[in-house]
Protein backbone atom coordinates (compact mmCIF):
# COMPACT_ATOMS: atom_id res chain seq x y z
CA UNK A 1 0.00 0.00 0.00
CA UNK A 2 1.22 3.50 -0.82
CA UNK A 3 2.49 5.46 2.17
CA UNK A 4 2.94 9.22 2.22
CA UNK A 5 5.51 11.03 4.31
CA UNK A 6 6.15 14.56 5.50
CA UNK A 7 9.60 15.29 4.13
CA UNK A 8 9.98 18.72 5.73
CA UNK A 9 8.09 21.89 6.49
CA UNK A 10 8.42 25.49 7.51
CA UNK A 11 6.38 28.25 9.04
CA UNK A 12 6.61 31.96 9.52
CA UNK A 13 6.88 33.42 12.98
CA UNK A 14 3.35 34.27 14.10
CA UNK A 15 2.44 37.93 14.31
CA UNK A 16 -0.10 39.51 16.61
CA UNK A 17 -3.17 41.28 15.26
CA UNK A 18 -1.90 44.54 13.72
CA UNK A 19 1.59 43.39 14.61
CA UNK A 20 4.78 42.75 12.68
CA UNK A 21 3.08 40.95 9.77
CA UNK A 22 0.25 43.46 9.35
CA UNK A 23 1.35 44.55 5.87
CA UNK A 24 1.56 41.02 4.43
CA UNK A 25 -1.36 39.34 2.70
CA UNK A 26 -2.14 35.74 3.52
CA UNK A 27 -0.83 34.58 0.14
CA UNK A 28 2.43 36.48 0.62
CA UNK A 29 2.90 34.72 3.95
CA UNK A 30 1.97 31.43 2.30
CA UNK A 31 4.61 31.93 -0.39
CA UNK A 32 7.27 32.47 2.27
CA UNK A 33 6.25 29.25 4.04
CA UNK A 34 6.13 27.23 0.81
CA UNK A 35 9.59 28.44 -0.24
CA UNK A 36 10.94 27.58 3.18
CA UNK A 37 9.38 24.12 3.17
CA UNK A 38 10.85 23.29 -0.24
CA UNK A 39 14.28 24.52 0.82
CA UNK A 40 14.20 22.47 4.03
CA UNK A 41 13.06 19.42 2.07
CA UNK A 42 15.78 19.96 -0.57
CA UNK A 43 13.05 19.55 -3.17
CA UNK A 44 13.04 21.80 -6.26
CA UNK A 45 9.80 23.60 -7.07
CA UNK A 46 9.77 21.82 -10.44
CA UNK A 47 8.91 18.52 -8.71
CA UNK A 48 5.73 19.84 -7.08
CA UNK A 49 2.58 18.50 -8.75
CA UNK A 50 -0.18 20.05 -6.63
CA UNK A 51 -0.56 22.75 -3.98
CA UNK A 52 -3.26 22.81 -1.29
CA UNK A 53 -3.49 25.75 1.11
CA UNK A 54 -6.10 26.39 3.76
CA UNK A 55 -7.41 29.91 4.27
CA UNK A 56 -10.55 30.97 6.09
CA UNK A 57 -10.77 34.72 5.56
CA UNK A 58 -10.71 35.08 1.79
CA UNK A 59 -12.85 38.18 1.23
CA UNK A 60 -10.68 40.78 -0.48
CA UNK A 61 -7.81 38.32 -0.90
CA UNK A 62 -8.17 38.07 -4.66
CA UNK A 63 -8.80 35.02 -6.79
CA UNK A 64 -7.33 31.69 -5.71
CA UNK A 65 -5.13 32.60 -2.74
CA UNK A 66 -3.44 29.19 -2.82
CA UNK A 67 -2.39 29.70 -6.43
CA UNK A 68 -1.16 33.20 -5.61
CA UNK A 69 1.06 31.70 -2.91
CA UNK A 70 2.27 28.88 -5.15
CA UNK A 71 3.25 31.13 -8.05
CA UNK A 72 4.94 33.63 -5.72
CA UNK A 73 6.92 30.74 -4.21
CA UNK A 74 8.31 29.84 -7.63
CA UNK A 75 6.06 26.88 -8.37
CA UNK A 76 5.22 26.59 -12.06
CA UNK A 77 2.15 27.95 -13.77
CA UNK A 78 1.39 24.39 -14.89
CA UNK A 79 0.89 23.22 -11.28
CA UNK A 80 -2.73 23.36 -10.08
CA UNK A 81 -3.63 24.73 -6.66
CA UNK A 82 -6.58 24.44 -4.32
CA UNK A 83 -7.71 26.80 -1.56
CA UNK A 84 -9.79 25.05 1.12
CA UNK A 85 -11.86 26.45 3.96
CA UNK A 86 -12.76 24.09 6.77
CA UNK A 87 -12.37 26.83 9.34
CA UNK A 88 -9.70 26.04 11.96
CA UNK A 89 -9.31 22.56 10.43
CA UNK A 90 -8.19 23.93 7.06
CA UNK A 91 -4.45 23.50 7.58
CA UNK A 92 -4.66 19.91 8.79
CA UNK A 93 -7.28 19.04 6.19
CA UNK A 94 -4.88 20.25 3.49
CA UNK A 95 -2.32 17.68 4.68
CA UNK A 96 -4.96 14.95 4.95
CA UNK A 97 -6.10 15.65 1.39
CA UNK A 98 -2.51 15.57 0.16
CA UNK A 99 -2.11 12.17 1.81
CA UNK A 100 -5.31 10.88 0.20
CA UNK A 101 -4.26 12.09 -3.26
CA UNK A 102 -0.87 10.42 -2.93
CA UNK A 103 -2.41 7.17 -1.68
CA UNK A 104 -4.78 7.29 -4.66
CA UNK A 105 -1.70 7.58 -6.92
CA UNK A 106 -2.88 10.90 -8.33
CA UNK A 107 0.36 12.67 -7.37
CA UNK A 108 3.74 11.91 -5.82
CA UNK A 109 4.69 15.38 -4.52
CA UNK A 110 2.19 17.77 -2.94
CA UNK A 111 2.75 20.97 -0.99
CA UNK A 112 0.11 21.40 1.71
CA UNK A 113 -0.34 24.14 4.26
CA UNK A 114 -2.32 27.02 5.60
CA UNK A 115 -2.13 30.79 5.53
CA UNK A 116 -4.01 33.60 7.20
CA UNK A 117 -3.85 37.32 7.69
CA UNK A 118 -6.52 38.06 10.25
CA UNK A 119 -5.25 41.65 10.25
CA UNK A 120 -6.09 42.01 6.55
CA UNK A 121 -9.67 40.76 6.95
CA UNK A 122 -11.89 43.54 5.58
CA UNK A 123 -15.20 44.92 6.74
CA UNK A 124 -18.28 44.00 4.72
CA UNK A 125 -21.21 46.14 3.65
CA UNK A 126 -23.88 43.54 3.06
CA UNK A 127 -26.67 44.19 0.54
CA UNK A 128 -24.83 47.23 -0.81
CA UNK A 129 -25.24 46.02 -4.38
CA UNK A 130 -29.02 46.40 -4.18
CA UNK A 131 -28.74 49.69 -2.29
CA UNK A 132 -30.28 51.22 0.83
CA UNK A 133 -33.27 53.56 0.71
CA UNK A 134 -33.11 54.97 4.22
CA UNK A 135 -31.58 54.57 7.67
CA UNK A 136 -28.41 53.33 9.28
CA UNK A 137 -26.29 50.61 7.70
CA UNK A 138 -24.37 47.90 9.54
CA UNK A 139 -20.83 47.07 8.48
CA UNK A 140 -19.75 43.52 9.34
CA UNK A 141 -16.28 42.48 10.45
CA UNK A 142 -15.25 39.66 8.08
CA UNK A 143 -12.97 38.19 10.74
CA UNK A 144 -15.69 38.05 13.38
CA UNK A 145 -18.62 37.19 11.13
CA UNK A 146 -16.99 34.53 8.94
CA UNK A 147 -14.26 33.38 11.31
CA UNK A 148 -15.21 33.66 14.96
CA UNK A 149 -19.03 33.66 15.11
CA UNK A 150 -21.00 30.43 15.43
CA UNK A 151 -23.57 30.57 12.65
CA UNK A 152 -25.79 27.89 14.20
CA UNK A 153 -26.34 29.56 17.57
CA UNK A 154 -25.70 33.15 16.44
CA UNK A 155 -23.09 33.96 19.05
CA UNK A 156 -19.30 34.23 19.33
CA UNK A 157 -17.57 30.89 19.54
CA UNK A 158 -16.16 31.95 22.88
CA UNK A 159 -19.68 32.41 24.24
CA UNK A 160 -20.62 28.97 22.91
CA UNK A 161 -17.56 27.48 24.60
CA UNK A 162 -18.50 29.26 27.82
CA UNK A 163 -21.93 27.59 27.70
CA UNK A 164 -20.34 24.17 27.32
CA UNK A 165 -18.09 24.97 30.28
CA UNK A 166 -21.23 25.00 32.42
CA UNK A 167 -21.48 21.28 31.64
CA UNK A 168 -17.78 20.39 31.70
CA UNK A 169 -17.23 22.34 34.92
CA UNK A 170 -13.68 23.51 34.24
CA UNK A 171 -12.90 26.17 36.80
CA UNK A 172 -11.47 29.58 36.12
CA UNK A 173 -8.27 28.63 37.94
CA UNK A 174 -7.81 25.43 35.91
CA UNK A 175 -8.07 27.40 32.68
CA UNK A 176 -5.78 30.18 33.91
CA UNK A 177 -3.17 27.67 35.05
CA UNK A 178 -3.27 25.89 31.70
CA UNK A 179 -2.97 29.18 29.78
CA UNK A 180 -0.05 30.40 31.87
CA UNK A 181 1.75 27.10 31.32
CA UNK A 182 1.28 27.46 27.56
CA UNK A 183 3.14 30.78 27.60
CA UNK A 184 5.85 29.46 29.90
CA UNK A 185 6.44 26.34 27.79
CA UNK A 186 6.52 28.31 24.54
CA UNK A 187 8.97 30.83 25.98
CA UNK A 188 11.22 28.04 27.22
CA UNK A 189 11.06 26.31 23.84
CA UNK A 190 12.18 29.47 22.05
CA UNK A 191 14.99 29.94 24.56
CA UNK A 192 16.13 26.34 24.01
CA UNK A 193 16.05 26.65 20.22
CA UNK A 194 13.24 24.13 19.76
CA UNK A 195 11.48 26.18 17.09
CA UNK A 196 14.63 26.77 15.03
CA UNK A 197 13.89 23.74 12.85
CA UNK A 198 10.51 25.06 11.72
CA UNK A 199 10.49 28.87 11.82
CA UNK A 200 11.96 30.87 8.95
CA UNK A 201 12.52 34.62 9.24
CA UNK A 202 10.34 37.12 7.42
CA UNK A 203 12.02 40.21 5.99
CA UNK A 204 9.91 43.29 6.66
CA UNK A 205 10.70 46.21 4.34
CA UNK A 206 11.46 49.53 6.04
CA UNK A 207 11.06 53.05 4.67
CA UNK A 208 14.82 53.42 4.67
CA UNK A 209 17.67 51.00 5.10
CA UNK A 210 17.73 47.24 5.24
CA UNK A 211 14.64 45.13 5.92
CA UNK A 212 13.88 44.20 9.51
CA UNK A 213 14.02 40.48 10.20
CA UNK A 214 10.99 39.14 12.07
CA UNK A 215 12.18 35.93 13.67
CA UNK A 216 10.05 34.94 16.69
CA UNK A 217 6.38 34.51 17.58
CA UNK A 218 5.42 37.82 19.10
CA UNK A 219 2.43 36.81 21.22
CA UNK A 220 4.38 34.85 23.82
CA UNK A 221 4.63 36.42 27.28
CA UNK A 222 7.27 34.55 29.24
CA UNK A 223 6.33 36.13 32.56
CA UNK A 224 2.66 35.12 32.37
CA UNK A 225 1.35 33.55 35.57
CA UNK A 226 -1.99 32.15 36.62
CA UNK A 227 -2.15 34.85 39.28
CA UNK A 228 -1.80 37.57 36.65
CA UNK A 229 -4.43 35.96 34.43
CA UNK A 230 -6.80 35.78 37.39
CA UNK A 231 -7.07 39.57 37.23
CA UNK A 232 -8.59 39.58 33.74
CA UNK A 233 -12.31 40.10 33.26
CA UNK A 234 -14.44 37.34 31.70
CA UNK A 235 -14.63 37.89 27.95
CA UNK A 236 -18.02 36.48 27.04
CA UNK A 237 -20.25 36.48 30.11
CA UNK A 238 -20.21 38.42 33.34
CA UNK A 239 -20.00 35.28 35.46
CA UNK A 240 -17.95 33.37 32.89
CA UNK A 241 -14.60 31.63 33.24
CA UNK A 242 -13.04 32.31 29.81
CA UNK A 243 -10.90 35.43 29.41
CA UNK A 244 -8.69 36.86 26.69
CA UNK A 245 -5.87 35.08 28.50
CA UNK A 246 -7.35 31.58 28.23
CA UNK A 247 -8.37 31.91 24.58
CA UNK A 248 -6.15 31.66 21.52
CA UNK A 249 -4.76 34.87 20.09
CA UNK A 250 -5.93 36.52 16.86
CA UNK A 251 -2.88 36.28 14.64
CA UNK A 252 -1.20 36.29 11.22
CA UNK A 253 1.04 33.60 9.76
CA UNK A 254 1.53 30.67 7.39
CA UNK A 255 2.94 27.16 7.37
CA UNK A 256 3.58 24.54 4.70
CA UNK A 257 4.85 20.97 4.43
CA UNK A 258 6.10 18.84 1.56
CA UNK A 259 4.09 15.61 1.44
CA UNK A 260 5.53 12.88 -0.77
CA UNK A 261 5.00 9.30 -1.81
CA UNK A 262 7.47 7.37 0.36
CA UNK A 263 8.77 5.46 -2.66
CA UNK A 264 9.42 8.76 -4.45
CA UNK A 265 11.28 10.09 -1.42
CA UNK A 266 13.44 6.96 -1.36
CA UNK A 267 14.08 7.28 -5.10
CA UNK A 268 15.29 10.87 -4.54
CA UNK A 269 17.46 9.84 -1.61
CA UNK A 270 15.49 11.95 0.86
CA UNK A 271 14.84 11.39 4.52
CA UNK A 272 11.54 12.41 6.12
CA UNK A 273 10.18 13.60 9.43
CA UNK A 274 7.19 11.30 9.76
CA UNK A 275 4.87 8.92 7.99
CA UNK A 276 1.22 9.93 7.79
CA UNK A 277 -1.11 7.38 9.32
CA UNK A 278 -4.85 7.24 9.86
CA UNK A 279 -7.19 10.21 9.75
CA UNK A 280 -9.99 10.92 12.19
CA UNK A 281 -12.75 13.22 10.92
CA UNK A 282 -15.80 13.87 13.11
CA UNK A 283 -18.70 16.24 13.60
CA UNK A 284 -21.53 16.93 16.04
CA UNK A 285 -23.76 16.30 17.84
CA UNK A 286 -23.89 20.11 17.92
CA UNK A 287 -21.61 23.04 17.15
CA UNK A 288 -19.65 23.02 20.42
CA UNK A 289 -15.88 22.59 20.31
CA UNK A 290 -14.64 20.91 23.47
CA UNK A 291 -15.07 17.23 22.57
CA UNK A 292 -14.12 17.45 18.91
CA UNK A 293 -10.34 16.87 19.19
CA UNK A 294 -10.83 13.90 21.52
CA UNK A 295 -13.50 12.39 19.28
CA UNK A 296 -11.29 12.84 16.22
CA UNK A 297 -8.28 11.33 17.98
CA UNK A 298 -10.32 8.33 19.11
CA UNK A 299 -11.50 7.75 15.56
CA UNK A 300 -7.96 8.02 14.18
CA UNK A 301 -6.60 5.67 16.85
CA UNK A 302 -9.29 3.13 16.05
CA UNK A 303 -8.47 3.28 12.35
CA UNK A 304 -4.75 2.98 13.08
CA UNK A 305 -5.40 0.01 15.36
CA UNK A 306 -3.63 1.48 18.39
CA UNK A 307 -4.65 2.79 21.80
CA UNK A 308 -4.22 6.18 23.41
CA UNK A 309 -1.49 4.90 25.74
CA UNK A 310 0.70 4.21 22.70
CA UNK A 311 0.92 7.92 21.86
CA UNK A 312 4.24 9.63 22.54
CA UNK A 313 3.53 13.10 21.13
CA UNK A 314 0.19 14.92 21.22
CA UNK A 315 -0.48 18.33 19.68
CA UNK A 316 -3.97 19.75 20.25
CA UNK A 317 -4.85 23.22 19.05
CA UNK A 318 -5.54 25.51 21.98
CA UNK A 319 -8.56 27.33 20.59
CA UNK A 320 -9.44 27.76 24.25
CA UNK A 321 -7.84 26.29 27.36
CA UNK A 322 -11.15 24.50 27.93
CA UNK A 323 -10.76 22.60 24.64
CA UNK A 324 -7.31 21.29 25.56
CA UNK A 325 -8.43 20.44 29.10
CA UNK A 326 -11.48 18.58 27.79
CA UNK A 327 -9.30 16.62 25.36
CA UNK A 328 -6.88 15.59 28.09
CA UNK A 329 -9.69 14.52 30.41
CA UNK A 330 -11.81 12.70 27.83
CA UNK A 331 -8.87 10.75 26.41
CA UNK A 332 -7.17 10.10 29.75
CA UNK A 333 -3.97 11.62 28.39
CA UNK A 334 -0.82 12.25 30.37
CA UNK A 335 -0.65 16.08 30.34
CA UNK A 336 3.14 15.84 30.13
CA UNK A 337 3.00 14.72 26.48
CA UNK A 338 0.43 17.30 25.35
CA UNK A 339 1.61 20.55 23.73
CA UNK A 340 4.99 20.26 25.39
CA UNK A 341 6.20 23.50 23.77
CA UNK A 342 3.06 25.53 24.30
CA UNK A 343 0.23 26.16 21.91
CA UNK A 344 -2.10 28.67 20.31
CA UNK A 345 -2.85 30.46 23.58
CA UNK A 346 0.79 31.55 23.57
CA UNK A 347 1.93 31.56 19.94
CA UNK A 348 -1.37 32.51 18.31
CA UNK A 349 -4.01 30.97 16.07
CA UNK A 350 -4.03 32.19 12.45
CA UNK A 351 -7.16 30.27 11.49
CA UNK A 352 -6.09 28.59 8.26
CA UNK A 353 -2.51 28.00 9.41
CA UNK A 354 -2.83 26.28 12.79
CA UNK A 355 -3.58 22.76 11.59
CA UNK A 356 -0.39 22.73 9.54
CA UNK A 357 1.62 24.28 12.35
CA UNK A 358 0.72 21.65 14.93
CA UNK A 359 1.15 18.78 12.44
CA UNK A 360 4.60 20.03 11.47
CA UNK A 361 5.54 20.53 15.11
CA UNK A 362 4.43 17.01 16.02
CA UNK A 363 6.38 15.58 13.07
CA UNK A 364 9.53 17.43 14.14
CA UNK A 365 9.19 16.16 17.69
CA UNK A 366 8.95 12.58 16.40
CA UNK A 367 11.97 13.13 14.14
CA UNK A 368 14.02 14.38 17.09
CA UNK A 369 12.97 11.35 19.14
CA UNK A 370 13.80 9.00 16.29
CA UNK A 371 10.84 6.78 17.14
CA UNK A 372 7.29 6.85 18.37
CA UNK A 373 3.75 7.73 17.43
CA UNK A 374 2.13 11.14 17.51
CA UNK A 375 -1.17 12.80 16.77
CA UNK A 376 -2.23 16.30 15.81
CA UNK A 377 -5.83 17.36 16.32
CA UNK A 378 -8.07 20.40 16.28
CA UNK A 379 -11.64 21.45 16.84
CA UNK A 380 -13.35 23.50 14.17
CA UNK A 381 -16.24 25.90 13.87
CA UNK A 382 -19.61 24.28 13.37
CA UNK A 383 -18.71 21.46 15.75
CA UNK A 384 -16.18 19.47 13.73
CA UNK A 385 -12.85 17.83 14.51
CA UNK A 386 -9.87 16.45 12.59
CA UNK A 387 -6.91 14.35 13.70
CA UNK A 388 -3.89 12.82 11.96
CA UNK A 389 -1.74 9.98 13.26
CA UNK A 390 1.98 10.36 12.58
CA UNK A 391 4.78 7.83 12.94
CA UNK A 392 8.46 8.70 13.21
CA UNK A 393 10.24 8.31 9.88
Swiss-Prot record:
Family: Belongs to the thiolase-like superfamily. Thiolase family.
Any Pfam family matching the protein: Thiolase_N
Taxonomic lineage: Bacteria, Bacillati, Actinomycetota, Actinomycetes, Mycobacteriales
Gene Ontology cellular component terms for the protein in this record: extracellular region; plasma membrane
Disulphide-bridged cysteine pairs: none
EC number per UniProt: 2.3.1.9
InterPro entries named in the record: Thiolase (IPR002155), Thiolase-like (IPR016039), Thiolase_acyl_enz_int_AS (IPR020615), Thiolase_AS (IPR020610), Thiolase_C (IPR020617), Thiolase_CS (IPR020613), Thiolase_N (IPR020616)
Protein's name in the database: Probable acetyl-CoA acetyltransferase
GO terms for MF: acetyl-CoA C-acetyltransferase activity
Keyword Acyltransferase appears in the UniProt entry: yes
Propeptide: 2
Keywords from the named record: Acyltransferase, Transferase
Gene3D superfamilies in the record: 3.40.47.10
Catalytic activity: 2 acetyl-CoA = acetoacetyl-CoA + CoA
Gene this protein is translated from: fadA4
Listed PANTHER family: ACETYL-COA ACETYLTRANSFERASE, CYTOSOLIC, ACETYL-COA C-ACYLTRANSFERASE
PROSITE patterns per the UniProt record, alphabetical: THIOLASE_1 (PS00098), THIOLASE_2 (PS00737), THIOLASE_3 (PS00099)
Active site: 88, 349, 379
Amino acid sequence: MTTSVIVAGARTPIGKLMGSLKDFSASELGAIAIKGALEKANVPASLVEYVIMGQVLTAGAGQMPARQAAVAAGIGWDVPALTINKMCLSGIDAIALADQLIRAREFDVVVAGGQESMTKAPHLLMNSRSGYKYGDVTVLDHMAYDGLHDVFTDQPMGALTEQRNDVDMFTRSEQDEYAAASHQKAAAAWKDGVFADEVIPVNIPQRTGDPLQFTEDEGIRANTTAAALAGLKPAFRGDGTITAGSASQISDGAAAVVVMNQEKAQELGLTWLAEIGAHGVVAGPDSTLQSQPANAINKALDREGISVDQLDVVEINEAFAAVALASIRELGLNPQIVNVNGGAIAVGHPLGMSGTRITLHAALQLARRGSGVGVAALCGAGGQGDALILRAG
